[in-house]
């Protein structure tokens, strides 16, 4: 190639810029501007001038190489589009071109490199000119190149419309053309770089939109084609094998037909429409992404086929002619199970529909509990393996005991689904039947998806009440029912395989699996041999005896004679098997004995005999169906093993119907009596609670066996064990009970230590009653103490209330004394204040004569009488002569007579004793103690009955009198600090009262002071008195005035003295002293 003279940095192309950057070990990513800046910086670091530096590069024929590279790229893209079977459109560039375009666009957003442009001096106008020149050249060349993809496009677009009709020969012809083309695209580097510059303006906006679709197609061209060509049948065969094994495992609970199909079940539509060769060709042409999609499309078809197979499955006949066992066999040790035909199959449809991939199919295969051997796999499968439980299945499966025989697998599945995902639910019935031949118990086998759901179901369902029964849950790995179920499944599969080989024709390669199943199903009712569960070694002897005993039939002579009168001579009994249906119509009367006796210990000698009678009665009850369901079954025992007629074991009395022996009847009669009265007569100390617990389960009996540690310790130190009462002594201790029964042989009789356990149980109950009584007595004592405390608090409150009333009365008395001190006498009568002395007393006397009605109690009212009933009447008034003399000296004779007469008339008119005459006087000592004495007080009425409202409403005269009183009240209230309350009455307070007996009042506890001097010469104040601001009052009186009178008493109050009812009565009986 000729060398170019030289170029400046602005004249370099993108490829040349990248070459220069590669030489210097710098990054080549980014657009031309970024590359130029990066190279400019590198030149400056080397000490060169980027503007003057000249670069030398080889000149390459751009146009020819560009066209040739475009042709090669378009040819490679067309070939790739034909392989992938998709139209490529206008995309004609190579993969490397798209990768470089993408790198250039990503680097346009590089902000770090763009910031460098500001730091360097670039001639942007010269770059723009060069770019426009290059773009013009590229646009001209692109116009010349454009017609070429138009010729290729129709060929590419027609490929998807042919609908995969190519033959594999065409693929083989096209493949050699690809291999020489693709290495040319990879090896040629410079033309590819030039294509970017040529088609930058035209192809860039188109390829940017289609690039996300273009890139995955080019990447997937080679590898998927090689997989499909090199391994055309690997993936479909894996799916087919997984599906086959899943179908075999999915139907393991039933006796279904074992014929399976390989390819036909998965893709039945392809079989009908196209030959097998074309199907293999299409498998080669499929992409790996479409394989799961095809499985999802074909999945419902295979599921429908399996549903048909399950509908026509051979179901094991559950009504096997088995001989019923004894009703009283403990079910905890039951090992013989029968599978219920109404089991629910494994949940294999939902995992198939939701998880169609081969790995998930393998997981479902591993989780299935059984494996039904097919015709091809039955010979290869090991017979030693367990057909029902695997190690993984045992970890997630549980047994549920105690379900009713009518339980269905769907209901069990619904019950267990609330705790987690249920994979399988099966129902097993026990072979033990009752007297009517019905199944006694039902066992459910449930397999969960994980161990967490199984543990949650165990904790939730154990001891749960379901359909009237208590469920018991066990793990499959720990239950003995697992071995019985495995034996049953193994026996069933072996018998089913043998019957299938004998009844069905040889296997043919016909593709109709449903038809083969139908032929197997049609042969199911023709099988006469019952399939028995494997017998345990312990019950072989019982089964041998049970088969030997057969039910006797009615004799011909008895049916001919119609059961006539009994004959005197015995004759051999003959039987006719033709009339077997009419045999025991009168004999079968009742059902099984009560459930309580089923847990008792059984005698080993009588168990086979009872089993024989139970089986015989069950057969006779199913044939005859006579009687009711609440009485006892009575049957005779006939041994027909040796001869046709047989012999009756017991002695026969002809008077008894149906030749029932009397000894058997007597023994049955005792059992009937036992059912009515289950327990023997008990002693008097035994309670009814023991009878209830005695009839319950074994948990109560174990609780009764527990003895308290204290009693056990006491018993160890005793020399002799506690005496035991014999069972014969018990009836004698119970009075009024029914006569005792004769000693009888009954199974499950009480052990000898039963009375001792009863005594211990009752002693514990008595101790509990005593402790409860003690607790109740303690509670009652506590309640009594609380009541006493409440009563005491009420008395205290009442006491405080009386104290407050007395304090208010004291204040009122003080105000009355200050207002009426001139007269020296104060009469309080029914709410009316009467004062002696001057015109006031006269006016009031006039008022009393005019309104009192001549001694009538007009001012009392009904309220005074109501108050009279509440308190005891006050004693009659007693005035000492000294007090009368004091009144005469202080107030004058005339005024004294008026006030006394008015008070006497009021006292006589009001018979209720509600008049209170207060003769008050105070003294002002020189030492300023101001301890005013009050005496002559009668009773202490309530303030409510002496309100002045009634007094104010009587007349205008009464109101005028109140005004006279209230006119003096402010003056009295203003003079509450010194000697006299009012100046006009100052002489009264200066009067000497030392000669009169004075009572100091009650102390703080409501009692009379011990230091009170009752002599006339010594009137020392009591230690309990207290002096207030305006003179301490030792007697506290009820408030008789209105709120006006009480308003001025605030500063004269002394501390209240405590008083109770007895202290309050001192005012009644000691008021005159």
Curated annotation (Swiss-Prot):
GO biological process: digestion; regulation of mRNA processing; regulation of transcription by RNA polymerase II
Record's compositionally biased regions (Acidic residues): 91-111, 128-151, 223-232, 248-265
Keywords for the protein's UniProt record, in alphabetical order: Digestion, Nucleus, RNA-binding
Domain SAP: 9-43
UniProt name for this protein: Pharyngeal muscle protein 2
Basic and acidic residues compositional bias, start-end: 112-127, 156-182, 207-217, 277-293, 573-587, 707-727, 742-759
Task performed by this protein: Involved in pharyngeal muscle development and ensures pharyngeal grinder function during feeding. Plays a role in the defense against the accumulation of ingested live pathogenic bacteria in the intestine. Has a role in the determination of life span.
Disordered as annotated region, ranges: 59-186, 207-305, 337-388, 481-759, 845-917, 1015-1073
Gene that encodes it: phm-2
Organism whose genome encodes this protein: Caenorhabditis elegans
């Amino acid at each position: 190639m000729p060398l170019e003279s030289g170029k400046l940095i602005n004249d370099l192309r993108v490829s040349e810029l990248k070459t220069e950057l590669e030489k210097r070990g710098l990054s080549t990513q980014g657009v031309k501007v970024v590359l130029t800046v990066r190279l400019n910086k590198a030149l400056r670091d080397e000490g060169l001038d980027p503007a003057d530096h000249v670069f030398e590069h080889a000149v390459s024929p751009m146009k020819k190489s560009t066209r040739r590279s475009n042709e090669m790229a378009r040819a490679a893209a067309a070939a790739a589009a034909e392989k992938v079977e998709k139209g490529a459109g206008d995309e004609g560039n190579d993969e490397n071109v798209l990768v470089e375009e993408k790198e250039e666009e990503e680097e346009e957003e590089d902000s770090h490199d763009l910031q460098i442009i500001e730091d360097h001096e670039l001639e942007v106008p010269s770059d723009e000119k060069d770019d426009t020149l290059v773009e013009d050249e590229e646009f001209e060349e692109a116009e010349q190149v454009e017609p070429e993809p138009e010729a290729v496009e129709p060929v590419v677009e027609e490929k998807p419309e042919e609908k995969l009709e190519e033959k594999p020969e065409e693929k083989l012809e096209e493949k050699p053309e690809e291999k020489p083309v693709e290495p040319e695209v990879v090896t040629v580097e410079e033309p590819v770089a030039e294509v970017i510059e040529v088609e930058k303006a035209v192809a860039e906006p188109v390829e940017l939109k289609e690039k996300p679709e273009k890139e995955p197609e080019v990447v997937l061209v080679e590898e998927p084609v090689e997989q499909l060509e090199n391994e055309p049948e690997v993936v479909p065969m894996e799916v087919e094998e997984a599906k086959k094994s899943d179908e075999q495992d999915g139907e393991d609970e039933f006796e279904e037909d074992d014929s399976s199909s390989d390819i036909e079940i998965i893709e039945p539509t392809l079989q009908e429409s196209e030959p097998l060769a074309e199907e293999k060709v299409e498998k080669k042409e499929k992409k790996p992404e479409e394989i799961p999609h095809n499985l999802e499309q074909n999945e419902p078809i295979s599921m429908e086929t399996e549903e048909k197979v399950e509908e026509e499955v051979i179901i094991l006949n559950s009504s096997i002619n088995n001989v019923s066992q004894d009703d009283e066999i403990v079910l905890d040790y039951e090992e013989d199970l029968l599978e219920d035909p109404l089991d629910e199959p494994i949940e294999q449809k939902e995992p198939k529909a939701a998880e169609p991939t081969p790995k998930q199919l393998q997981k479902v295969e591993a989780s299935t509990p059984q494996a039904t051997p097919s015709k091809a796999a039955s010979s290869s499968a090991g017979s030693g393996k367990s057909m029902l439980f695997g190690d993984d299945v045992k970890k997630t499966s549980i047994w549920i005991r105690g379900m009713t025989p009518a339980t269905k697998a769907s209901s069990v599945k619904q019950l267990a689904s609330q705790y987690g995902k249920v994979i399988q639910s099966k129902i097993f019935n026990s072979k033990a039947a009752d007297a009517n031949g019905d199944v006694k118990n039902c066992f459910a086998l449930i397999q969960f998806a994980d161990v967490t759901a199984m543990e949650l179901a165990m904790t939730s369902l154990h001891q749960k009440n379901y359909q009237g029964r208590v469920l018991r849950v066990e793990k499959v790995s720990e239950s003995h029912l697992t071995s019985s179920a495995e034996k049953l499944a193994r026996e069933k599969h072996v018998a089913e395989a043998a019957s299938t080989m004998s009844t069905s024709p040889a296997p043919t390669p016909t593709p109709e699996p449903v038809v083969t199943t139908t032929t197997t199903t049609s042969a199911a009712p023709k099988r006469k041999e019952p399939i028995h569960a494997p017998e345990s070694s312990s019950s072989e002897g019982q089964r041998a005896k049970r088969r030997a005993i057969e039910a006797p039939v009615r004799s011909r002579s008895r049916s001919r004679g119609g059961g006539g009168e009994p004959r005197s001579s015995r004759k051999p009994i003959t039987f006719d098997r033709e009339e077997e249906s009419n045999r025991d119509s009168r004999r079968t009367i009742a059902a099984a004995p009560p459930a309580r006796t089923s847990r008792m210990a059984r005698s080993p000698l009588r168990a086979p005999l009872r089993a024989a009678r139970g089986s015989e009665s069950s057969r006779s009850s199913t044939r005859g169906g006579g009687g009711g369901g609440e009485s006892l079954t009575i049957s005779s025992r006939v041994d027909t093993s040796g001869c046709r007629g047989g012999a009756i074991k017991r002695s026969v009395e002809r008077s008894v119907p149906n030749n029932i022996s009397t000894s058997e009847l007597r023994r049955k009669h005792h059992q009937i009596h036992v059912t009515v009265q289950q327990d023997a007569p008990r002693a008097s100390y035994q309670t009814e609670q023991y009878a209830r617990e005695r009839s319950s389960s074994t948990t109560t009996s174990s609780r009764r066996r527990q003895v308290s540690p204290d009693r056990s310790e006491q018993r160890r130190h005793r020399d002799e064990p506690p005496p035991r009462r014999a069972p014969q002594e018990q009836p004698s201790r119970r009075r009024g009970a029914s006569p005792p029964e004769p000693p009888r042989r009954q199974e499950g009789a009480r052990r000898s230590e039963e009375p001792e356990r009863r005594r211990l149980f009752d002693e514990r109950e008595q101790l509990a009653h005593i402790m409860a009584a003690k607790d109740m007595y303690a509670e009652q004592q506590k309640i009594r103490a609380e009541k006493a405390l409440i009563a005491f608090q009420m008395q205290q409150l009442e006491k405080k209330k009386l104290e407050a009333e007395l304090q208010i009365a004291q204040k009122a008395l003080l105000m009355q004394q200050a207002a009426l001190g001139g007269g020296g006498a104060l009469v309080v009568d029914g709410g009316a204040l009467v004062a002696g002395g001057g015109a006031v007393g006269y006016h009031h006397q006039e008022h009393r004569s005019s309104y009192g009605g001549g001694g009538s109690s007009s001012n009392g009212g009904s309220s005074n009488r109501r108050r009279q009933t509440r308190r005891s009447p006050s004693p009659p008034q007693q005035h000492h002569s000294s007090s009368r003399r004091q009144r005469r000296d202080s107030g004058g004779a005339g005024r004294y007579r008026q006030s006394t007469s008015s008070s006497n008339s009021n006292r006589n008119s009001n018979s209720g004793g509600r008049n209170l005459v207060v003769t008050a006087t105070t003294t002002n000592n020189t030492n300023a103690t101001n301890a005013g004495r009050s005496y002559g007080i009668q009773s202490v009425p309530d303030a409510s009955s002496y309100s002045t409202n009634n007094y104010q409403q009587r007349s205008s005269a009464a109101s005028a009198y109140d005004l006279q009183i209230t006119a003096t009240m402010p003056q009295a209230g203003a003079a509450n600090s010194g000697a006299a309350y009012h100046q006009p009455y100052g002489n009264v307070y200066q009067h000497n009262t030392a000669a009169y007996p004075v009572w100091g009042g009650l102390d703080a506890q409501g009692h009379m002071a011990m230091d009170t001097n009752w002599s006339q010469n010594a009137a020392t104040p009591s230690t309990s008195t207290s002096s207030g601001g305006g003179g301490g009052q030792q007697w506290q009186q009820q408030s008789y005035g209105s709120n006006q009178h009480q308003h001025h008493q605030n500063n004269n109050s002394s501390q209240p003295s405590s008083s109770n009812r007895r202290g309050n009565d001192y005012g009644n009986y000691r008021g005159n002293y």
